[in-house]
From Swiss-Prot:
It comes from Lysinibacillus sphaericus (strain C3-41). Keywords: Chaperone, Cytoplasm, GTP-binding, Nickel insertion, Nucleotide-binding. SUPFAM superfamilies: P-loop containing nucleoside triphosphate hydrolases (SSF52540). This is Urease accessory protein UreG. It is found in: Cytoplasm. Its main location: cytoplasm. The keyword Protein biosynthesis does not apply.
Amino acid sequence: MKPIRIGIGGPVGSGKTSLVDQLTRVMHEHYHVAVITNDIYTREDAQYLITNGVLAEERIIGVETGGCPHTAIREDASMNFAAIDDLTKRFKNLDIIFIESGGDNLSATFSPELVHGYIYVIDVAEGQDIPRKGGPALTRSDLLLINKTSLAPHVGVDLDIMDQDVKKMRGGRPYIFADVRSQTNVDKVVEWIQHHMLLEGAEAVDNHG
């Protein structure tokens, strides 16, 4: 069985790398995990995870995409597929590969060929009206994570209003309010991955892989 591939997308500074860090800290104790990060000109996110995270360096690959980060996760994902191939050859028993995109806008989505599902991260500091702006990533991602809730009172954001807007824009798709840095509700993200990606994703891989 192939490892389940989970995309982590979102604008620059929304907390993607912090989320990957927290998820790997929790999940590496029970699952065989690896990570691919996408940066335009550097491997900074990969280096952060190597330096500060819990995974061995050989389980983390940094991809330098150049140009538009959107292209590397959708139109031409060849560099990411090469990294996946590398990791699956290194580790025959991988359960999960997290693929973090470079920072992009609300229209950035992952190719369904590249990932089995993806989490899109926004943060409250982007403004209370961010959910109303829509965009495919915000409305159609498998899970929307609204991060940095602790900043809400400092940036004039009413989380109740934001919740109503998110609910309307998501049309029944799941979303979670969280504060990743303080680990608030990271457990809910883990539960979502376990129930909606590892179980359903494994079934999909078995059917198509």
